[in-house]
Every structure is written in structure tokens, then in C-alpha cells.
UniProtKB/Swiss-Prot annotation:
Protein name as annotated: T cell receptor alpha variable 24
Subcellular location: Cell membrane
Keywords: Adaptive immunity, Cell membrane, Disulfide bond, Glycoprotein, Immunity, Immunoglobulin domain, Membrane, Receptor, Signal, T cell receptor
Endpoints of the signal sequence: 1-22
Subunit field text: Alpha-beta TR is a heterodimer composed of an alpha and beta chain; disulfide-linked. The alpha-beta TR is associated with the transmembrane signaling CD3 coreceptor proteins to form the TR-CD3 (TcR or TCR). The assembly of alpha-beta TR heterodimers with CD3 occurs in the endoplasmic reticulum where a single alpha-beta TR heterodimer associates with one CD3D-CD3E heterodimer, one CD3G-CD3E heterodimer and one CD247 homodimer forming a stable octameric structure. CD3D-CD3E and CD3G-CD3E heterodimers preferentially associate with TR alpha and TR beta chains, respectively.
InterPro entries: Ig-like_dom (IPR007110), Ig-like_dom_sf (IPR036179), Ig-like_fold (IPR013783), Ig_V-set (IPR013106), TCR_variable_domain (IPR051006)
Sugar attachment sites: N42
Species of provenance: Homo sapiens (Human)
The protein's role, per its UniProt record: V region of the variable domain of T cell receptor (TR) alpha chain that participates in the antigen recognition. Alpha-beta T cell receptors are antigen specific receptors which are essential to the immune response and are present on the cell surface of T lymphocytes. Recognize peptide-major histocompatibility (MH) (pMH) complexes that are displayed by antigen presenting cells (APC), a prerequisite for efficient T cell adaptive immunity against pathogens.
Disulfide bonds: C45-C112
Domain Ig-like: 23-114
Origin organism lineage: Eukaryota, Metazoa, Chordata, Craniata, Vertebrata
Domain of life where this protein originates: Eukaryota
Length: 114
């Protein structure tokens, strides 16, 4: 079967909740996301702004161990690793994970841990 050269691969990015304590309400959105190759996207991790210590972002590919992407500790923190970046707002209680120009190798589960 001949492939259509105009059909762009579809990336599937999963976003799951991982929190240290059941007392903490950490919310992530969206839970799953389908992105066209080359498109940019972002995930949100919301957390209680009180008792903040650190927020961790991980990337987890099937059959591999989770890879630590960023540890966010300071309000206004901005970190970058290639096409992936993250920002932190401890006063409002959220962090964004951005993926610029998505590629097939970005297909993974992205985790936020508080």
C-alpha cells in the first residue's frame, strides 16, 4: 500500500497524575492529547500554592524508566531541554510543560509530581 505523502503522522501524548500524597490535590490537563507532527502543544499541572517545595516533570516511554525532565523550585522558574520547556508559577499554583514542533519521538507519557 502506497503512503500518502500529505498525511502527517499523528502523535499521541499521554499525561498522567502522579502525586506524593493523597492530601495534595494535583490536577493535570489534558489527560491525553493527539497532536499532528510539527504542531506545538502544552500541558498544565495545577497544585495547591501553599506548602510548595518542588514540582517535577517526567517523560515516560513504554518499556523504559521515567526520564526526569525538570525540577521546578522557584516562582518564575523557566527551564528548557531542546524543544521541551516548562514554566512555574507558585503564587497561582500551576506549571506548564510546552512541546514545540512535536515529532514522533515525543510520543510518551508526561508526568507531573508535586
Amino acid at each position: 500500500m502506497e503512503k500518502n505523502p500529505l498525511a502527517a503522522p499523528l502523535l499521541i501524548l499521554w499525561f498522567h497524575l502522579d502525586c506524593v500524597s493523597s492530601i495534595l490535590n494535583v490536577e493535570q490537563s489534558p489527560q491525553s492529547l493527539h497532536v499532528q507532527e510539527g504542531d506545538s502543544t502544552n500541558f498544565t499541572c495545577s497544585f495547591p500554592s501553599s506548602n510548595f517545595y518542588a514540582l517535577h516533570w517526567y517523560r515516560w516511554e513504554t518499556a523504559k524508566s521515567p526520564e526526569a525532565l525538570f525540577v521546578m523550585t522557584l516562582n518564575g522558574d523557566e527551564k528548557k531541554k531542546g524543544r521541551i520547556s516548562a514554566t512555574l508559577n507558585t503564587k497561582e499554583g500551576y506549571s506548564y510543560l510546552y512541546i514545540k514542533g512535536s515529532q514522533p519521538e515525543d510520543s510518551a507519557t508526561y508526568l507531573c509530581a508535586f
